[in-house]
């Protein structure tokens, strides 16, 4: 564990081992989120995969972390998306004021309303290959200590290895079966189905269709996932202007 003090190694390894013991493959990301909360001065954690045009929420330590994960997917903006795009950590240590609040004003407002004041996003991978992010949430503003950053990086590395090792393709049947993915991830298939339907209804590109979904979801105070479900069940229709 590069950067982790010798005296902390056994404690970190023990917590991770406790959390993942007897876990099914699809449970591993959620268990590692729980380990991150136990090991770090944070109130929540989530993990998202890097998807086509938007992140795919995979697992979270609780309802609030899952909600904030969905908020970024809906807005298409936030520190976690920046980390996925750059392959570098993004630490928003104070979403209530200053630089962080001005960089992501809408997300910062939504996070603060949910009681989160700081978000720390670590890439799962690096600048050359980034498969997603580990996102950490804290109720109070402030920077992570160096030891905590080292621990967070290690948990992110473990998550990266775990995600790459999860069965997929022929090992787990068709990807669409969601045999290893959590419900959060498989539910996001509906977003891509809705993008296709909006493309057909409005005669627009995939990027434009996703932008329309996001704009309508935000205007209605909903997540893009909830709106997508209405689109594919024909409850909501997008008509060309």
Predicted segments — roles?
Residues 149-160:
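Allosteric cytosolic regulatory segments
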Residues 118-125:
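Short hydrophobic beta-strand micro-motif common in sensory/regulatory domains
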Residues 133-142, 147, 163:
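Short beta-strand-to-loop transition segments that serve as allosteric relay/switch motifs
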């Amino acid at each position: 564990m590069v950067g982790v003090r010798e005296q902390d190694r056994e404690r970190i390894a023990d917590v991770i081992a406790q959390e993942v013991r007897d876990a099914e493959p699809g449970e591993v990301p959620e268990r590692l989120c729980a380990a991150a909360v136990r090991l770090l001065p944070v109130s929540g954690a989530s993990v998202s995969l890097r998807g086509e045009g938007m992140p795919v929420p995979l697992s979270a330590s609780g309802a609030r972390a899952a909600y904030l994960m969905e908020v970024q997917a809906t807005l298409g903006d936030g520190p976690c998306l920046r980390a996925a795009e750059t392959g570098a950590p993004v630490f928003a240590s104070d979403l209530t004021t200053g630089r962080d609040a001005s960089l992501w004003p809408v997300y910062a407002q939504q996070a603060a309303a949910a009681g989160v004041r700081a978000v720390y996003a670590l890439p799962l991978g690096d600048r050359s290959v980034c498969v997603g992010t580990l996102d950490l949430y804290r109720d109070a503003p402030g920077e992570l200590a160096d030891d905590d950053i080292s621990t967070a990086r290690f948990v992110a590395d473990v998550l990266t290895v775990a995600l790459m090792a999860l069965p997929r393709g022929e090992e787990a049947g068709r990807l669409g079966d969601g045999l290893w993915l959590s419900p959060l991830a498989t539910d996001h298939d509906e977003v891509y189905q809705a993008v296709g339907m909006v493309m057909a209804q409005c005669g627009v590109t995939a990027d434009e269709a996703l932008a329309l979904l996001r704009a309508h979801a935000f205007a209605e105070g909903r997540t893009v996932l909830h709106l997508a479900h209405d689109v594919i069940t024909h409850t909501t229709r997008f008509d060309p202007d």
